Each structure stands twice: as C-alpha cells, then as structure tokens.
C-alpha cells in the first residue's frame, strides 16, 4: 500500500495535458540594393515555413508589415501590407521581407502570399505566391 501513493503521484505528473502551441510569426524587412527582384519562396522546415520575397515601391518611404492566418485544411495565408510612412527618396526601392511562421504541426500546407499596397490609393491586392509546402 505504501508504494501506491508515490505511483499515483508519478502517473498524475506524467499524464497531465499540455496546451497545444499556437502558430507564431516573425516578420523582418529591409531595403536591398543591386538586385531587380527576387522570386517569392516558401521553404519548409521542422514546424516552420519561411516565406521571403521582394516588393518594389516608388520610393524609400514605404514600410512593410506582416500578418498570417492558418485556416481550415491547413490553408496558410501570409499577408504583407505596404504603407507610405515617410517621404523617402524618390527612386524605385526594393523592399526585402522574410516571414517565418513557426509552431506548425507536420503536414501539407496550401500557402498563399498576398501583397496589399495601400499607398498611393486605391488599395491594390496581389496574390504573389501559391503552392503546397510540406512541414516536417
């Protein structure tokens, strides 16, 4: 009977449920020089998909912001919003971005990347990439 108490405590400690992790986004961007453009890519990893690409803007006064949504049937949408946030220099500018979506369960994902250009008006939405990516 003495062994039953510690055994029950051990089983209770080992069998406690944990909350599933929620997908996360790390978004980085910056201006690049010397390249006209780069293809948009979606590269899988262990629990991650890294999307990267370039958006050309009319000047250096634009800022990029990232967002994402995981929908039903593993549909992953990465949205890159582009806003005019300052005067910048008046020449075509290449804005590189990298969006790393993490904490994804393994499986095939239908990945869509959308660019939303807010300035100058009117707002324009472009589907920049679509493909299936397998996450380990």
Model feature map: region roles:
Residues 107-113:
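A short tyrosine-centered beta-strand micro-motif
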Residues 1-4:
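Positively charged n-region of N-terminal signal peptides that target proteins for export
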Residues 79-105:
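An anionic, turn-rich surface loop/hairpin at beta-sheet edges
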Residues 51, 95-99, 111, 131:
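Hydrophobic residues positioned within well-ordered beta-strands of beta-sheet architectures
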Residues 114-118:
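Beta-strand-rich extracellular modules
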Residues 11-13:
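C-terminal motif of bacterial Sec signal peptides marking the signal peptidase cleavage site
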Residues 15-79, 120-136:
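Primarily secretory-pathway and cell-envelope proteins
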């Amino acid at each position: 009977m003495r062994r039953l108490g510690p055994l029950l405590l051990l089983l209770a400690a080992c069998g406690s449920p944990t909350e599933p992790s929620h997908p996360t986004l790390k978004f980085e961007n910056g201006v690049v020089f010397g390249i006209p453009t780069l293809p948009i890519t979606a590269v899988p990893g262990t629990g991650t998909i890294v999307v990267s690409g370039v958006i050309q803007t009319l000047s250096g006064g634009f800022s990029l912001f990232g967002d994402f949504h995981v929908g039903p049937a593993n549909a992953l949408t990465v949205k890159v919003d582009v806003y005019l946030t300052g005067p910048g220099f008046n020449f075509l500018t290449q804005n590189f971005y990298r969006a790393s979506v993490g904490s994804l369960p393994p499986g095939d994902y239908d990945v869509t990347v959308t660019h939303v250009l807010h300035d100058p008006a009117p707002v324009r939405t472009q589907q920049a990439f679509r493909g299936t990516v397998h996450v380990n």
